[in-house]
Amino acid sequence: MSSLLASLVLWGFVAAVLIDEEEHSNPKLPTEFSRWKKWITVNFTWMYILTQDVWFIFVLWLLFTKYANIKLGKDDDKPEFSDFAWFSMLFSCGIGVGFYYYGVSEPIYHYRQSGNLQKLPVTNDDQKAQQAIFQTLFHWGLHGWIPYIVVALTLGVVCHRQGLPMTMRNAFHPLIGDHTKGFAGDVIDALSISCTTFGVCTSLGLGVSQINSVLARLDGSVAVNQKTQTGIIWIITAVATCSVLLGLKRGIKSLSLFTFTIGLILLVLVTVCDNTWFLINSFVEAVGVYMTWVIQVGFNCGTWTQLNQEFDNGYEYEGKSLLWGKDSLSDKLFEATGIETSSALAIEKYDSGPEWMMDGWTIFYWGWWISWAPFVGMFIAKISKGRTVGQVIKGAFIAPILFSFIFLTFFGSLGIKMQRAAEMALDVQVDKSNWSIDCAAAGYDGRTPTSDAAIALADKGYYLLSCRNSNDRILDVMAPYGQLTTFMHLLVLVGITFYFVTSSDSGSFVDDIISAQGHENPPWIQRVYWAVTEAATAQALLSASESGLSTIQAVSIVAGLPYTIAICYCCTSLYRALKRELRDEDIMAQRHGFVVSSLDILELYSPEDMPAQSPSSGDRFKSNVIALFFPYKGLKTAAIAAYNDDVMGTIYAVVATCTWFTWFLCLCLSGIGEGTASIAWMLYCFFVAQVAIIRFHVRAARSIRDNFLNDLFASFAVYPMVVSQMELEAPYIEQRKQV
């Protein structure tokens, strides 16, 4: 079932792109993707930012507790791979081609193309360079790897120690028990396959354009266009398919070792060919700046820069509101004073940073990393059997971050150094108001040097990188190295290609395992199917818009949103699994959870002490429908049982039901009066809080472990099932009281 659901999503996406291109000369899907991306940034930046920080605090706490000594596997299990092979595999899987695409390009962008970016205090160009390196490390550091490690630890502890199949549904086994074997598990696995494929295709979309540029640089006859890139995708897919067919130890392990070694050689070469001490100084300084500012920037939601959008068509994109029920603030101001407002004017007036920084960079990155989490997390868990929780945190979280910092700092510093050298040689003036330069005045046109001075400087191997194409920048920084330049360009080509292959084969491998419900050796035709599906999705993403990258970014952010919630539950699941492994008293004394959970309508489970004559599926469905439109009956039954007071229970139920009816009425009238929708959702939140409080007391009476945050979330998302669930539990509270 999970394979079918995921296939419908992925091939449906491919079909939608093809139909859109066929029917419209100017395809509509890219606009829709961009609107979704903007909508998520406007409404859910806080969630992306906060969850990453909470996950990091949780994992850091685990490292210094007794749980760090628990093995991912039985107590006598030994690691299957050497430390170097293990690190090479997880790093090659976790990073992909992004290093080569962004290694030089991102620091240059933040240095000369990001406008008045204000993540750190900037008063001179040295601090601007420092901020550029920091912002790059921020996007590739702790917050990036944390989703991987949460999923990896959860799967490793639950599956390796409990002998469950290695599939994403079982990461939630400590929460919902054998519900993972039913439809709920199918949905989790289908979501994981879809997120994995979209996440991997984000990297493949970036990587294929990079490979195309390197080939064109080495051979001028190679065209840089979509046709060439389509061919590259399918050639790489063929190689990746062979790797998947060979399996984990013969195929993926060998390719990962080779890929990581190529990157290591390239890093050593640029270090010894350039000013070694400058690069080491830059690394040490960058780590210090990162440690100083990562907490403040890690909680930065761009609140005031995003507020500027309210002065520009009221959070609208292509004429559609991004905040439901909110009228345009700019329209009100214009009606009052006759003065037009805009986000651009607000940015200038209040000296704000660019509002697109969040959805264009930070939220894109968080969505990208999160969409990779089921894929990389499962892969790390798969190869980490026999290692302890503490060893995995150190080796699969801290170590790759440190290596990433070395690579990004070295290449980013070389890029900024070349930018400054070219600015000095061409006597380019920097506009201190937004730290930018005029490429045309500097002798560049169409990303190519055109003036005599710029051409002569390029012949010596130096370019104004901010005036160059993003794909060319990592090649440009190697241009000054004389006879080694071509060799290093070949290394870049090989490195990108094989990072592309390792990402593709690892993604197909994980999709294959999930769809086979954890089976170690699924049929070869199934492996080929997922590799082909991945390639088709990557091609669809690439062709969805002329720029390609904007659509790729949007899909990454959209795919990451639902999995953000899933990873939050992975933290709870991991915590419970670890406590049960050590048989902590507080958790062993309580019931496993609401066995009649919000999924009961689908899985037909019953309370653990319910007699054989349990309600039929028809009765349960009827109970859910009644709770959906008239929650009073279920709430009254549950509240009276939980509080052991008929009057108080009835009052609670009446107040909650009146709140629900008022919410529903305001919701129906939301299009009539301004602010009605806001009042409606405020009332709904009040109703949810009342349901959650009753659920909390029902759990306490039934000795069911959980927490109030989960009570709130369940009540908010599926209140009819929660009410029905409590109504079914209530009689057994009465039985215990009578006993």
Regions flagged by a language model, labelled:
Residues 1, 40-46, 75-93, 121-144, ...:
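Transmembrane-helix boundary/entry motifs in multi-pass membrane transporters
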Residues 28-37, 64-83, 108-135, 157-183, ...:
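Flexible loop linkers connecting adjacent transmembrane helices
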Residues 19-44, 210-228, 246-257, 275-282, ...:
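Membrane-lumen (extracellular) interface motif
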Residues 21, 29-41, 62-79, 131-139, ...:
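Membrane-water interface regions at transmembrane-helix termini and the short interhelical loops
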Residues 588-739:
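Intracellular leaflet-associated regions of eukaryotic membrane-associated proteins
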Residues 14-22, 91-111, 144-166, 188-220, ...:
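Hydrophobic transmembrane alpha-helices that form the core helical bundles
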Residues 180-495, 519-521, 541-548:
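Membrane-embedded translocation segments of transport machinery
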Residues 1-128, 572-578:
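N-terminal alpha-helical transmembrane segments of multi-pass membrane transport
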